[in-house]
Amino acid sequence: VSLVVSMSAFAQAIKVEIVKKEDGGYQLLRDSEPYIIRGAGVDGADLEELTSYGANSIRTWSIDGGVYPAAEILDKAHSLGMTVSLGLDFARERLGFDYNDKEAVAKQFEEAKANVLKYKDHPALLTWFIGNELNFDFTDPAVYDAVNDVAKMIKEIDPNHPVTTTIAGFDKKAMKAIQDRAPALDFISFQLYADVVNLPKYIKNFPYTGPYMITEWGAVGHWEVYNTKWGAPVETTSSEKASNYAKSYLQAIQSQSSQVIGNYVFLWGQKQERTSTWYGMFLKSGERTEAVDVMQYIWTGQWPDNRTPRVSAIGLDGKVAFDDVYLFTDETYSAMLNVADPDQDKVTFRWEIRKESTATEVGGDREYEPPVIEGLIEDPSSQEVTFQAPSEAGAYRLFAYVLDGNGNAAHANFPFFVK
């Protein structure tokens, strides 16, 4: 019989606090020392690999709703010298929860309290995140009364860890509700993608003068790009994504260090959200993309010894995705992808065609990935491919992947419509 006991059962909490500096800015302290978060949002990621790239902190979205339970994540993080901003899942109004239902709100409060009591003394704990993007499609500001009640409770039983909630975008209505109804929060957390470069302007104009984190940032969001005439979002390539990571960090985080007390890049892992490559920094098969190179440089000042391939957009019979390309059933077409490998590695290619996702979920809710349609591409391992348009009319997407044999990859895709 083996007995597994979480560190939180006997460990000593490490005090974390936010202090105001002489210059008017803010500083996160851990154990009385300045703590610079080099963070990533994870769900099921290899934390040892993450630390090897220079990260020192992770954030989660729930206690036990992810791949690994909180106790396991905290213990693993602690063994690696990492910290965890722990998510307390909160029900969302857009999914049917009523924040005027006192019984349901009280039940949620007690669940949060039980989790706080369970994990508050874990040495890897850094901050508490109450809910995620509770402002998404919200109409009832009472949600922030519930957030405040939990924040007050946490401060009473756990004075060692600051408390926040995360906001999708820069939402003035949510900001007003938080200021009016949730004064117990220690800081606010924002989650923006392409628009993150405008966050300093939004903060200044609102105005908000307190400390904040940016707890999701990275790729350009699927709602922020050009849509084809049939409504398919045009995804950036892995190289374009990497450039956006660098730009976002420089303009929204590094330049705003007086108010930004930390950040968590999204997503150290992979997920299906409109496509399987849109937000993850890894492919489903595990290969690293160029965004990982950028994050290692941001975290350590050093590029990896072996870099990822770089790609440009797919060309389909001389056209690009912004051309709203229509194909005819069963007709033959060609596509190609230009690639450059910084290390002159021998690269291999993989192409596939899938139906366009019909997902309409918002806020990161789970989505179904359409399967690969086999037999349409003549030689899916070539740099330039010939393929047959599907025999069924509708929206599709052509995907291309480039692998360098060293665990690195690049990707691009091209939406098209068959008629």
Name each region found by the language model.
Residues 144-249:
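Noncatalytic carbohydrate-binding groove/subsite architecture in carbohydrate-active enzymes
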Residues 1-6:
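Bacterial N-terminal signal peptides
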Residues 412-418:
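C-terminal edge beta-strand
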Residues 7-11:
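Sec/Tat signal peptide C-region and signal peptidase I cleavage site
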